[in-house]
Amino acid sequence: MIGKAFIILSLLNELPTPTAAQAAQGGALGKDVWLPLAKFTATAAKIPGRAAKLLQDRSAQIVNLMKLQVQADICLNKAASEVSALGWQALAVAIAADIGSLQSLQQQRSEEAIAAAAAAEFARGHAAEFFKVAAAVQSAANSGCLTTNNKGGAAGSVINGFSTLGTAEQPAIGATSTAHVGDDITAITTTGFSDLAATDGIRTDSLTADTNCVLFKGGSDGPLTTANFGQSIPFAGGYLTRNPTANTASSADGTDFVSNPEDSKIAGIKVYRDAHAAAAKIRTAATFGSTFTDFKKLDQAKKSVHLRAAVKNIILGKPDGSVDDLSGEIDTKINQVFGEDQETFHSRFWDQLTKVKVEKAASGQEETTLDAITSFAALSRARTYYSTKVIKGLRDKISSLEIKNSKTEVKVTDADCNKHQSKDKCAAPCKWNENTTDINKKCSLDPVKATEQQAAQTAGAGEGAAGTTTDKCKDKKKDDCKSPDCKWEGETCKDSSILLNKQFALMVSAAFVALLF
């Protein structure tokens, strides 16, 4: 029995056994080799649309901020209290500064977006050309250069197009699209493209069993039928390079261009490296600088460097101080003026847009509330209308004060001086002359002193212009400090004309501030 069994086993060993399919010269490129490149094309095709969306977002934010600034300016002109006016002024200044920051970088951001789109399309063009050529040489199910089978697999499943493949497998080989892409492109990492995984390029082991494909052969029966070609062929921008030696690898890795820029795996795919360098600048909205401050949200407004600076300069009145050094005071003042929660903030400020009435004369539209006006032109017209109205009111007050001031000025005449019959009462601008023959005119007007005093009164300058007392009034008691020459203020008797000039100066200053905003 043992002898018979031995004979049977020996015979079985002699029988032919089926062999697995093997990669061969003339095989089609396996799907697991070309699929990373196909995924990259889909990623790259999104970049122009993402760039366009990010630029549109920046432009829309600038327009939105411009409207908010105009609304804040109108509310400032119509503010019912000083605290409210200061708050609106700080908001308007902060929003204007934010607009300035965005606009100053707009050209740079536009150039970065264009560069990203151009570089991505250039790289995608290399890949798209590869897919078009490789698929075009198919002639039958078992004859062609691309297959949906993996490397080392059986011949067959050769393709001449990609429409029948799943969405995740289809290479993007069509025209450039700028259709907006709203989300960040996660396949663009900080170091490279996650799609472009490490590869050995095209070699015999990358192929399937023979499908009559000459394009990827590495020997003398390849593209050059008389001899091996002289150097590597950089298919698809070098990512799928074919070495002239049949099974020699041509390594490439597009997932990391940063850690080792001189790595040999990067040397042959510089077109993808350049594409990543440009695309990385629009990798996320934050990277591109398209994360914006929403000044209607208290938590964001409080963090705005522009609002904090405005609060420091305008509300605290400390323009020379540092925002960092005054951080505690700024936080306290923000809470006092704007509120400590979103509801209070909106109640004090942005909800007022629904209550502020804008008449037709201001906007050119039928009377409505400020929040209902969407036209920037109408908003700008209303701001000009109310600003002009405020400035006119200030000018009217200044004119009134000038008239009052001129009427109140005391002009001493020679006859006034003649009334003083003793030297101790003959004070400036009068002058005592002991040698005059006319005893009724020993005290007479000194023209020089009279001119000096009149000039001081007119300009609000001279002794007492800053609110100090003058010789005429300084020694008088409260009961003797009477108009038109003097006026009691605080604990001293002061020149009334100087007080009027001081008030006039304050009004001029107020008008100047109004013109600035």
From Swiss-Prot:
What cystine linkages occur within this chain?
Answer: 417-430, 426-443
**Source organism, top-level taxon:** Eukaryota
The protein's matches in Pfam families, at most eight in alphabetical order, are given as: Trypan_glycop (PF00913), Trypan_glycop_C (PF10659)
Biased segments, Basic and acidic residues type: 471-487
Bilayer topology annotation: Lipid-anchor; GPI-anchor
Chain positions listed as propeptide in the UniProt record = 496-517
Q: Which residue numbers carry lipidation of type GPI-anchor amidated aspartate?
A: 495
- Glyco sites are at 435
Residue stretches of biased makeup (Low complexity) = 454-470
Q: Kindly indicate whether the keyword Protease belongs to this entry.
A: no
Annotated signal sequence is 1-21
Compartment annotation: Cell membrane
Q: Which UniProt keywords apply?
A: Cell membrane, Disulfide bond, Glycoprotein, GPI-anchor, Lipoprotein, Membrane, Signal, Trypanosomiasis
Which coarse location class applies to the principal site listed for this UniProt protein?
Answer: membrane
GO biological process annotations for this chain's record?
symbiont-mediated evasion of host immune response
SUPFAM superfamilies per UniProt: Variant surface glycoprotein (N-terminal domain) (SSF58087), Variant surface glycoprotein MITAT 1.2, VSG 221, C-terminal domain (SSF118251)
Q: Where is this region: Disordered?
A: 454-487
Q: Which GO terms describe its cellular component?
A: plasma membrane; side of membrane
State the protein's purpose.
VSG forms a coat on the surface of the parasite. The trypanosome evades the immune response of the host by expressing a series of antigenically distinct VSGs from an estimated 1000 VSG genes.
- Designated name of the protein: Variant surface glycoprotein MVAT5
Upper lineage:
Eukaryota, Discoba, Euglenozoa, Kinetoplastea, Metakinetoplastina
